Amino acid sequence: MLKDELLNQYITYIYSCSCAETLVKSGVKPTMTAGYSMGIYASLYIAGSVSFETGLLFIRKAYEAIRGSLPHDKFGMGGVIGLSEKDIRDITDHHNLDIVMVNRNSDHSFIVAGSSFHINLFLLKSREEGALHARSLGVTIPYHTSHLSEAANKLSETVYSADVVDPETPIISVLGQDLILDAGRARKEVVNNIHTPFNWLATQLQMFNSGIRIFTECGPSQALRKNSKFIPGSGKFVKWVNLVRKDRDGLMR
């Protein structure tokens, strides 16, 4: 299972970098980038902070650090849509669940992580409470939780010795919504990302408040574009392929 998760991260990274590169080569350059969860690596690459190879290195070293510090089958993650933060905390507290809310996509869309048994129980109770959607994310790693603190320390050995430079394009942190403008801050984000909860809702709203109105998702999923419909006043998401500038013959540049 873990090897499949590593392969999926490689594929997603390569796809995301390819999409973003296609846009840039056609003349569409980002004002700002943001990395949703493990999207931090592609975000750093397209911002010019790391090479493509360094991004792959970070993914592999993070996987190896996690593999060396966690049991393979005792953790998981889940997504729930249709409940409030209070609903989720009430379920967690009432059933004494060993889970953590690790991301808020919108006011009624959340990601949780923790014990696989408790994740499954949480999803069951969420459906009973009226959640519109509650499912396992199919991973065995509790990303963005303190369970990965040891792995983060191990990963830092690679990150702080790797070639990382100041980003050419500002990167907004999904952890704290501040701008990542230098190499030191970029390194810190990579290390903290795997064991710290993030907030996509706050991140997208911060980008909107900074003047950005057009967003695109460079990856195989359209989840963020769909999610944006539930964030009032957050700008417009456009499919990346629809933003690619074309030549007179209608071909991508």
Label every PLM stretch briefly.
Residues 29-31, 132, 213-214:
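Short acidic/polar active-site loop segments enriched in Thr and Asp
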Residues 1-34, 112:
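Helix-rich "cap/lid" substructures immediately adjacent to catalytic or cofactor-binding pockets
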Residues 16, 31, 35-39, 43, ...:
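Gly/Ala-rich beta-loop-alpha elbow adjacent to hydrolase catalytic centers
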Residues 223-253:
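Short acidic, glycine/proline-enriched helix-loop-strand junctions
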Residues 47-195:
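Alpha/beta catalytic cores of group-transfer enzymes, especially the acyltransferase/condensing modules
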Residues 194-212:
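A short, acidic, amphipathic alpha-helical segment used as a generic capping/interface helix at domain edges
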Residues 16, 39, 80, 112, ...:
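Conserved small-residue
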